[in-house]
Swiss-Prot record:
SUPFAM superfamilies: DBL homology domain (DH-domain), PH domain-like, WD40 repeat-like. Keywords: Cytoplasm, Guanine-nucleotide releasing factor, Phosphoprotein. One of its GO terms (cellular component) is cytosol. It comes from Mus musculus (Mouse). One of its GO terms (molecular function) is guanyl-nucleotide exchange factor activity. Residues 1-94, 161-202, 1133-1163, 1186-1207 are annotated as: Disordered. GO terms for biological process: positive regulation of stress fiber assembly; SREBP signaling pathway. This is Rho guanine nucleotide exchange factor 10-like protein.
């Protein structure tokens, strides 16, 4: 098979002929310093690799400096291969090429060299790997001199000119590397012609690339056996490494970019494997950062210098937390590879196949590479912290690359699949389960494999929290502040994308799991597999069945799936063969349940029914209700009155109180027949007993109602009875907490609205794959209403604001389904005529007009001014607290065309105008904004009028002449109030004023065209988006440095919706909950995602375009927002404990802190002693007659009570007996997250659905004509 006398080996860097002979005996004696090579990539079918007989691969050999997957020889014809070569070489693009270096020479070299070097195995052969992104470097790539350009840029033949072209790999080439390279190879006995017949003809670039690989591989072999210039080469490598580390330490983007590009070019001294056995084929070009002789030092802060400010001390501590957190994270990634992956790959017999190991640990190595590089740069930055104090740019440079997103996306999308493989292996392979248990026991912290693998999913939220803390302690003007804001934006955007991809992956997994539990022939299976279903909500709820008297019959956990058009309920079916084994497995990795579908129904037929609901949503007379588990159906009206769905204990206590009240009433009648007069036994005392019992009953009913905050009652359609009457059955689910119930009610309501024609679809997501759908958080068009009740006049819209008012009369579900509570104030008018103000109530699912009144001139702008306590919790709140007699209510300000400013109270819609004034001039009031110090009015002549805040009933001093500041010669189109500044636009320039003194700080040009004016400004995070009077572009500016950061052309988002439309202008802007709403003069509304945190609100996504719009320009975009009452969020346990805890306190201690651990014991003692049955009567000392008692009479002290307050609880409920207090503020509610109900309102002429004809939808009458002023209201899902 081989010849044993190979000719001499050429020198390093010399061109090698295709038939270059092997090394000579002289070279064999002086082996020099040998290079180590990696083992071949591990595959499940290990027999596919070409291994020299008798030479097994060594696992502990030193990894190579540079890795090659194959040894191609592209310059020879495959048919010319010697007949002895049974396994033809397969190059990376899949071509089978005959070996120019014959099998005779290969095996001879192997026998000669194996006597003095480590054992070596040729890499496993691969196929179906296509390099599809290889750029052509020079037109003369095939000239003989081109072969000398190797990957080693410092290794060249003496006297030969160095190639000037860049032979490295770019990041885009590595990102386009095919992931199919990890596929198993076919048996080597397959004929070459069969392989080659399926491969395309090689391009010249690929041919040149293969030749270069052959040359490089041969020179590496020459280095291995020669090695005479090794010392010189190592010195050059170390020098180059030092230069690159200095570049990384420089802290500039250029230095970091040079380091990254050096690594991407596979610089030899940076390419060394630290993780043994990690030879996956899915390499993305991210190389290990361990160096040959230089190991990067661990990041460590030096001693704290003297004289640091408190903020600098805090920043050092935060930096230490970042270093510690990153070190722990990198160690966890190494543990995954070293403690789990590598042993599983090397285990014989294998507990998990190599293919499954690659799937389970997919992209872990690449994630480790990213963070190892970040740790090197972090180490250099930490060493220089006291002189630079910069770290934001390091985060930007490390995590803004698409490669990081791709690696993490692959890992996150594969996470569910990896856990599924681990779960299945635990159930079917005891050796694998034993391996996991042993590894967990051996670890110091006892963290499971799942606990380690979930850390990459949680990594970026941890970074965000640390950077937020760092940004809070970085003052303005600090060189690191803008970098930190950009870093926060990059991490937030990355985390949002990963969360969305994780949500989609989990959604697909849940639907697939549900589909497996349905028969293939069922209609539900066809619906689930059609690809048209979107999972909106999925949760495990407890289904309960109650009897007629409220007793709990049974309960069982169900998995409930809310799809975009149906509701599915399934049993959670656990069938473990060994219950104990199941528990052991669940402690190592979460087990996914198997489902058995119980029922499913179309979403429009599902109704949410609340306890005490009047039944207006369904017809009681023609409906029978059968409770789940009941054998007999009852009429809806009877069932509504008889069934109580509270806890059995509360229901029993309520019934006992009802019986006791009947007995006490009989006692009262008997007392009225007494002939004597007694101080503590008379009709006054008896009536007080009755009132006290009635109050206890009301409290008990409220407790039952509070318990129902976690009860979701669904009315579902059933089969009709024998007479044909429809039967609906009631299903009661217990949710984990009130938030869960709110979420279910809200999503059910919005999902029904989403099935309307105007929302099918409601948004278009332009994407390359044409498969993306509107996400579940997408706003849904709830209604379309005329802006003005009077249609006789053609009124133009001027502005709109929302005045939030919480209504305590709304029920629990009404809060979840209605629009944000409060009132909409809509202003407008007609040119040359008067104005009109319309007030809508939003305390229902659709708005309705409650008041309309005229004003002297058309309304041009409206501003809502909240309570000072609502607006700011600092100085304003303390100012109001110092003068309790001053009550400042929310107000609404109107700016008119005739220069008038009108002030109205916003709480009571019947309130008359509180104050009015005229602007200087008088000039039309184009815009209004309020700040903590002034009410600012932008006028037509470029003057800014400022009305100072007062401490009277009217919050602004409108009687005195305002402070006037000339901003520019043109009109002030828009104003923006920031924390410490006010921005005013005049033409293309924006002037920045101090918020307190209104002194001009600076000004800048937002647009280069003098004829263009800034028309809109909205703030988000640390940036301000601006729109202009002409053009379709919007621009982003930094609030602190005023730097222009980004420009977006809206026209590119609407070209497919409005083909041929060349001129587009932005007419309105709004930012709300991470979404930038853009209205155009064509009636089209564009939605763009922006970050929500304190970073820079850059736009990175493609956004969405609404198919619902206006026939004319979008006049304004406004937000309606209200916060749900805190008592709604209290769970049933807290509600049950709340009144009971208050019962144990005297009246003067009702608002103290939560009782200690002995409160439960005190309640039990009170219950055993009994309740003092008193309501209004605190003492009977003032009543006539003797005291009926065997004890001595009490001292004649009128202030003394007959009983101690600790014995009773009735009179502590409220000071006024006629007022029923629902709940008192609780300390545990202080930390609760606020839940905002949000709706977006757009105003313009008419309504248009861009998927159909203008003015309406097919088959439905248009709500208004094309010329009427119209409001479109979008409802946003609750952010829980």
């Amino acid at each position: 098979m081989a010849s044993s006398n190979p000719p001499p080996q050429p020198a390093i860097g010399a061109p090698l002929a295709p038939s270059a002979p092997g090394p000579s005996p002289e070279v064999e004696e002086d082996s020099g310093e040998a290079f180590e090579f990696d083992d071949s990539d591990e595959e499940e079918d290990t027999s596919s690799g070409l291994v020299v007989p008798g030479l097994a691969p060594e696992r502990d050999t030193e990894p190579s400096l540079i890795c090659f997957d194959t040894v191609p020889g592209s310059d020879l014809d495959p048919a010319a291969a010697p007949p002895q070569t049974e396994a033809p070489t397969v190059v990376s693009n899949g071509d089978a090429v005959g070996a120019a270096i014959s099998g005779v020479r290969r095996s001879s070299w192997k026998r000669k060299s194996s006597r003095r070097i480590d054992r070596f195995t040729f890499p496993a052969l691969e196929e179906d790997v296509i390099y599809d992104d290889v750029p052509c470097e020079s037109p003369d790539a095939h000239q003989p001199g081109a072969e000398r350009g190797l990957v080693y840029e410092d290794v060249h033949r003496a006297g030969a000119p160095r190639e000037t072209e860049d032979l490295g790999w770019s990041s885009s080439e590595f990102e386009s590397y095919s992931e199919d390279s990890g596929e198993e190879t076919k048996p080597e006995a397959e004929p070459t012609k069969h392989r080659g017949s399926f491969q395309p003809k090689l391009s010249p670039d690929l041919t040149r690339l293969k030749e270069r690989y052959v040359r490089t591989k041969r020179d590496i072999l020459a280095l291995r056996v020669g090695g005479r210039d090794m010392q010189e080469l190592k010195l050059k490598c170390d020098c180059k490494m030092t230069q690159l580390m200095k570049a990384a330490k420089s802290g500039t983007r250029d230095g970091l970019e040079k380091t990254r590009m050096a690594v991407m070019r596979k610089v030899s001294f940076l390419h060394r494997k630290d993780v043994l056995g990690d030879s996956e084929e899915e390499d993305m070009g991210l190389l290990e950062v361990g160096v040959t002789d230089i190991k990067p030092p661990a990041p460590e802060l030096g001693p704290m210098p003297d004289g640091l400010s408190p903020q600098q001390v805090v920043r050092r501590h935060i930096l230490g937390s970042i270093v510690q957190s990153e070190g722990s994270y990198v160690e966890s990634l190494k543990r995954i590879l070293q403690d789990y992956r590598n042993p599983l790959m090397e285990m014989e017999p294998k507990a998990l196949s190599a293919r499954k190991c690659q799937v389970v640990f997919f992209r872990v190595k690449e994630i480790l590479h990213c963070h190892s590089m970040f740790q090197i740069a972090l180490s250099s930055r930490v060493a220089e912290w006291d002189s630079t104090e910069k770290i934001g740019d390091l985060f930007v440079a490390s995590f803004s690359k698409s490669m990081v997103l791709d690696v993490y996306s692959d890992y996150v999308n594969n996470f569910t699949n990896a856990m599924s493989i681990i779960k299945k292996a635990c159930l079917t392979k005891p050796a694998f389960l034993e391996f996991l248990k042993r590894r967990q026991v051996c670890s110091t912290d006892r963290v499971t494999l799942y606990g380690l693998m979930v850390k990459p999913v949680q990594r970026f939220p941890q970074f965000i929290l640390l950077l937020q803390d760092m940004l809070k302690n970085t003052p303005r003007g600090h060189p690191d502040r803008l970098s930190l804001q950009l870093a926060l934006t990059e991490l937030e955007t990355l985390a949002e994308k990963l969360n969305e991809q994780k949500r989609l992956a989990d959604q697909v997994a849940e639907i697939q799991q549900l589909t497996k539990s349905v028969s293939d022939r069922s209609s539900l299976n066809k619906l689930l597999t059609s690809g048209q279903r979107q999972l909106l909500l999925c949760e495990t709820l407890t289904e309960t069945v109650y009897g007629d008297r409220g007793q709990l019959i049974k309960s069982k956990e169900r998995r409930v799936f809310l799809l975009n058009d149906m509701l599915v309920c399934a049993n959670i079916n656990f069938k473990p063969s060994n219950h104990r084994g199941q528990l052991e497995i669940s402690s190592l990795v979460p087990l996914g349940p198997k489902y058995v579908v119980k029922w499913n129904t179309a979403l429009p037929q599902v109704q949410v029914v609340e306890v005490g609901q009047d039944g207006g949503t369904y017809d009681k007379d023609n409906l029978l209700i059968q409770h789940a588990g009941a054998k007999k159906a009852t009429a809806a009206g009877q069932a509504q009155n008889k069934v109580y769905l509270g806890p059995p204990r509360l229901f029993q206590e309520l019934q006992d109180l009802q019986k006791d009240l009947a007995v006490v009433e009989q006692i009262t009648l008997l007392i009225s027949t007494l002939h004597g007069t007694y101080q503590n036994l008379n009709m006054t005392v008896a009536q007080d007993w009755c009132l006290a019992l009635q109050r206890l009953m009301r409290v008990k009913e409220e407790e039952i109602h509070s318990a129902n905050k976690c009860r979701l009652r669904l009315l579902l359609p059933g089969k009709p009875d024998k007479s044909g009457r429809p039967i609906s059955f009631m299903v009661v689910f217990i949710t984990p907490n009130p938030l869960s119930k709110i979420s279910w009610v809200n999503r059910l309501h919005l999902a029904k609205i989403g099935l309307r024609e105007e929302n099918q679809p409601g948004w278009l997501c332009p994407d390359e794959d044409k498969k993306s759908k509107a996400p579940f958080w997408c706003p849904i068009l709830a209604c379309c209403v005329p802006a003005f009740s009077s249609r006789t006049l053609s009124l133009q819209l001027g502005g709109l604001v929302h005045s939030p008012v919480n209504s305590p009369l709304l029920g629990f579900s009404a809060v979840s389904t209605s629009l944000p509570q409060g009132y909409l104030w809509v202003g407008g008018g007609q040119e040359g005529a008067g104005g009109q103000v319309e007030i809508f109530s939003l305390n229902r699912p659709s708005p309705r007009t409650v008041k309309s009144f005229p004003v002297a001139a058309p309304v041009l702008c409206i501003e809502y001014i909240p309570d000072p306590e609502e607006e700011a919790e600092g100085a304003e709140e303390s100012r109001a607290a110092t003068d309790p007699s001053v009550t400042v209510h929310p107000t609404v300000c109107l700016g008119l065309q005739d220069g008038s400013i009108l002030l109205y109270g916003s709480v009571d819609t019947g309130t008359q105008c509180l104050a009015t004034c005229k602007s200087p001039g008088p000039q039309p009031v184009l815009c209004l904004r309020h700040s903590p110090f002034y009410l600012l009015a932008g006028l037509q002549d470029g003057t800014l009028a400022a009305y100072p805040r007062t401490s009277g009933d009217i919050p602004w001093d409108l009687e005195s002449p305002p402070m006037c500041i000339t901003v520019g010669p043109g009109p002030i189109r828009t104003l923006l109030s920031l924390e410490d500044a006010a921005w005013a636009s005049c033409g293309p320039r924006v002037t920045v004023l101090d918020a307190a003194t209104l002194q001009t700080q600076q000004s800048f040009e937002a647009h280069q065209d003098e004829a263009v004016s800034v028309t809109h400004m909205v703030k988000a995070g640390s940036g301000v988006w601006m729109a202009f009077s002409s053009g379709s572009s919007i621009r982003l500016f930094h609030t602190e440095t005023l730097e222009h950061l980004q420009e977006i052309n809206i026209a590119t988002r609407t070209t497919f919706l409005l083909p041929g439309q060349k001129h587009l202008c932005v007419t309105s802007l709004l930012i709300c909950q991470g979404l930038l709403w853009v209205g155009t003069d064509q009636g089209v509304i564009v939605l763009l995602p922006v970050p929500r945190l304190e970073g820079i609100p850059k736009i990175t996504g493609k956004g969405m375009v609404s198919l619902n719009g206006h026939c004319g320009p979008v006049a304004f975009l406004a937000v309606a927002m209200s916060i749900l009452a805190p008592d709604i969020l209290r769970s049933d346990q807290e509600e049950a404990e709340g009144p009971q805890a208050e019962e144990d306190k005297p009246d003067g201690q009702a608002h103290e802190t939560v009782p200690g651990p002995d409160s439960h014991t005190a309640r039990e003692l009170t219950r055993k002693k009994g309740i003092l049955l008193q309501y209004r009567l605190r003492s009977t000392a003032h009543l006539p007659g003797p005291l009926l008692s065997v004890r001595e009479p009490a001292p004649a002290d009128g202030s003394a009570l007959e009983h101690s307050e600790e014995d009773g609880s009735i009179y502590e409920m409220a000071d006024d007996p006629d007022v029923w207090v629902r709940s008192r503020p609780c300390a545990r509610d202080a930390h609760r997250k606020e839940i905002c109900s949000v709706a977006i309102i757009s105003g313009g002429q008419g309504y248009r659905h861009f998927g159909g004809a203008p003015g309406g939808l097919s088959g439905r009458a248009a709500p208004c004509s094309e010329t009427d002023s119209t409001l479109l209201i979008w409802q946003v899902p609750l952010a829980l």
